[in-house]
Amino acid sequence: MPLHHLTRFPRLELIGAPTPLEYLPRLSDYLGREIYIKRDDVTPIAMGGNKLRKLEFLVADALREGADTLITAGAIQSNHVRQTAAVAAKLGLHCVALLENPIGTTAENYLTNGNRLLLDLFNTQIEMCDALTDPDAQLQTLATRIEAQGFRPYVIPVGGSSALGAMGYVESALEIVQQCEEVVGLSSVVVASGSAGTHAGLAVGLEHLMPDVELIGVTVSRSVAEQKPKVIALQQAIAGQLALTATADIHLWDDYFAPGYGVPNDAGMEAVKLLANLEGVLLDPVYTGKAMAGLIDGISQKRFNDDGPILFIHTGGAPALFAYHPHV
């Protein structure tokens, strides 16, 4: 078993059973290709999402260190911050969130609805900043201040994307390979690539478990030149901690995130509407809508290796739909 070293890392059970892997018959008919979806949007805490996989490892480490406060950072509409705050509430921990407004909007829905509304329900301490220009340093500065107030803080990086957090997606690869036993000739896996932990964890896991399957990361905030080093750095760090080699190339498509992170575009919104209309599945304007736009266009442009089935990793994010109204 190439991933047996995963068991060395403490893990807090937050998700329980594997998330569903489903066939999408109407979308498949529409696109002329078998499409499957991994439903990490339906993880069981606070409207779901992929970050719970990372938090199982990160929060286990925080508890091992005796922390009473989780500190993290992200955009006002960050799904990661929402899930971190929910886990903190569930465990009786304090949560401090350092937030930025990456799109510079004054729209009330964006500033107060969606994920931001949920942060208040979880009694999160909000700290605003002009921009997360150096989030690791900014989080450490905040942690020092919180510690001086008598708390025992644990810093969780943006997106939960450290080598430890990304172990959650190495583990996800184990679920995927088991659930895909009946999927004949799986060709490709498509995932949104942002803070890079989900992408890197899958890259390590799938390289060892499904080496013939192509993994495509659709960027949501950066060009390939900017994103690829981030994914590779995490890929190598994860592999090092698991005593594995990681030689698989990192495949990225950067054609679908413009005009920038957190700003909806037409192709992404059309993908959101298409999945809702055909399958009753809710994507979001920031991550999964743009990743699905890449999948759809990739089929049209024949960018995939072959014509086999494609698996889409649904990382969640639907609460942001309310914040982005009336774009939706």
Swiss-Prot record:
Q: Which reaction does it catalyse?
A: D-cysteine + H2O = hydrogen sulfide + pyruvate + NH4(+) + H(+)
State the source organism's domain of life: Bacteria
One MF term in the entry's GO annotations: D-cysteine desulfhydrase activity
Required co-factors = pyridoxal 5'-phosphate
Pfam family name, one: PALP
Positions of modified residues (N6-(pyridoxal phosphate)lysine): K51
**Documented EC number(s):** 4.4.1.15
Q: Please give the biological process terms from Gene Ontology that the record holds.
A: D-amino acid metabolic process
Q: Which UniProt keywords apply?
A: Lyase, Pyridoxal phosphate
Question: What SUPFAM superfamilies does its record include?
Answer: Tryptophan synthase beta subunit-like PLP-dependent enzymes
Enzyme class name: lyase
Assembly with partners or alone: Homodimer.
Its family remark reads: Belongs to the ACC deaminase/D-cysteine desulfhydrase family.
Q: What does this protein do?
A: Catalyzes the alpha,beta-elimination reaction of D-cysteine and of several D-cysteine derivatives. It could be a defense mechanism against D-cysteine.
User: Which NCBIfam families does the record associate with it?
Assistant: ACC_deam_rel (TIGR01275), PRK03910.1-1 (NF003029), PRK03910.1-3 (NF003030), PRK03910.1-5 (NF003032)
The record's listing under HAMAP family reads: D_Cys_desulfhydr
Instruction: Give the protein name, as stated in the record.
Output: D-cysteine desulfhydrase
